[in-house]
Amino acid sequence: MSRPPLGRAEPPWPTIADVAARRAAGWRPTPLDSFVLKVHSRCDLACDYCYMYRSHDQSWRAQPRTMTPVTLARTAERIAEHLTTHGVTEAGVVLHGGEPLLIGDEALTRTVRTLRAAVGAGVRLHLSLQTNGLRLTEQRLDLLGELGVTVGVSTDGGRAAHDRHRRGADGRGSHARVEAALGRLASGRHRPLFGALLCTIDLRNDPVRTYEALLTHSPPAVDFLLPLGNWQTPPPGVDPSGRRTPYADWLWAVFERWYGARTKETSVRLLDNLLALLLGATPRTEALGLSPVRYAVVDTDGSLTQDDTLRTAYDGAARTGLDVHRHSFDALLLHPGIAARQWGTAALSATCLACPLHRVCGGGHYATRYDRATGFANPSVYCADLTELIGRVRRRVAADLGAHGAPLPSGAA
């Protein structure tokens, strides 16, 4: 596939989305209930696939390293304001980066206490942290336990798989240190803090070996992430013609191992969500389905942004021009980039709408739909892989249900 180089110009969609017209026709935004706080804008790893530091958007360079107490307090106030306005009684905050643990224990404690104090006792607030694992010492895990913060760790499986990408600035792999940290997190008194493992797929890694390497830590959940890319800059190994579907093959191997186990060893969220969609449920997931986006990102300077993964499209793709000092989260909900991702089928391309699987795949992860000519009004660059994977899983589930005299729900693709 040959396409022109990326530019800085805003794409036609969703910039041209007419939010005012949609509101006049009766659409009302779905309130947010999840907030990603970029508490530190730098990292102590230099992963070669990182969407923050290795993407077209380099705005992180202008961000302050940490969120000041003033910005933190204003962010907490804005979150509380939004939850109160919309009567939301359960919400989540993810401390993110960069590497969030670079802020240190004092700032971490202040951040958590500020957030809890702002939302008050009337809101059940779930606090979590996504880390590369390098700073998960016993003492820090004790602190996270005291603060009630669950932990997700990024790791790509075995040593060779992990260290191929997840290295320090000096080129040294991080696998041994992350494994030691996971040993502390996954056992004993720290086990209740364990949230999930996050693994980016690399086609060079054996899928079953990768999955089983992750299973050695008995994670409550595993998130397999498709490498970020789009029609302009396709991910590694994607076949532009759609004749080969290597990512479907990779995930199918994981599915067979996971689905065929005697007992459910862990939740593989992508596959659990796919099964739920095929059975007629509506799980909340960014990767599949049509559920409205209900989260926002706050940078260290207080800027309100869209999903960080949009940075892989072009410089400025995630920016909104809004910030917590001057704008509410309600204002963010009316930004075309956020609003369009709450419109379900109305925001899908004509190609997607003509496909019988569109309610299951939802067009694919939003960031992977980008093309310079049409913006995000396209199927995912993973369209062929998603189609193949959904078809295989559907046939397997239909056969199993049929063996027990229970067909797939009529609404399933």
What do the predicted segments below correspond to?
Residues 29-70:
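Canonical Radical SAM [4Fe-4S] cluster-binding loop centered on the CxxxCxxC motif
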